[in-house]
Amino acid sequence: MTDLVLYQISGAVGTITVNRPEARNALTFEMYDRIAEICAEPSADGSVKALIITGAGDRAFAAGTDISLFRGFKQPEDALAYEERIERVLSAIETAPVPTIAAISGACTGGGATIAVACDLRIASENSVFGFPVARTLGNCLSLSNYARLVAMVGAGRVMEMVVTAKLLDAAAAKAIGLISEVHPDRQAVMARARELAETVAGHAPLTMRATKEALRRLREGRRDDEDLIVQCYMSEDFREGLEAFLAKRKPDWKGR
């Protein structure tokens, strides 16, 4: 299992690699759970400041859930438990204490696409394709939470079109609708850019990024409470450090508190 989800730390950046290229990085339950575990605690000592999530090889970021897992679904509870499990994983990615970057190459579909959407930033190679082709493949559906994530990102009309037509979007089309922010020639270029982005955000104020992640999540859920986020940032040591550093024209030394 450990070999199917690799985790490497280099400096302040952690990289999660879905490592099942022979199966287009199709995900088992254990693989989903391992991704969630890492996102919940990228490092025990807080040294990891940004996470990259990617897939091994250039054929797929992740083609979705391993289809063989669905053969055991017999009762309504099986379907509900599956979606609840996936939601816990996606929530762990969304609420990770550090920014997450999906570095995509190849197929990013189904469950793989939901992981990418749950990340804070998404960049892709030219050979990438995106979509939720369940209307022409399995005949299942997305959970309400996943529809909400997609609608918040690209709008209800585009989500409807993606699902009912079961059409896969190429990288250029995905960028045009805001599903990804950058397109690069190949996986090597994507990984280099992901590392650059990760190192950039790793040097920024941790509390600002956490507050922004949480605020956007709350907005998607229709919430308007933000007092705790405002107080957390404005009353922090980092805010005082930022003020002093700005006035002294030096680089701030962020502590995340």
Segments and roles (model prediction):
Residues 4, 47, 55-92, 136-138:
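Glycine- (often His-adjacent) and acidic-residue-rich active-site loop
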Residues 89, 93, 109-163, 193, ...:
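CoA-thioester-processing core
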Residues 21, 123-128, 180-225, 255-257:
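C-terminal long alpha-helix characteristic of the crotonase
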Residues 1-2, 244-257:
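Terminal low-complexity tails and localization/encapsulation signals of metabolic enzymes
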Residues 97-107:
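A short, small-residue-rich loop immediately preceding and capping a beta-strand
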Residues 121, 161, 165-167, 173, ...:
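Well-ordered beta-strand positions
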Residues 1-54, 91:
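Conserved CoA-thioester-binding segment of acyl-CoA-metabolizing enzymes
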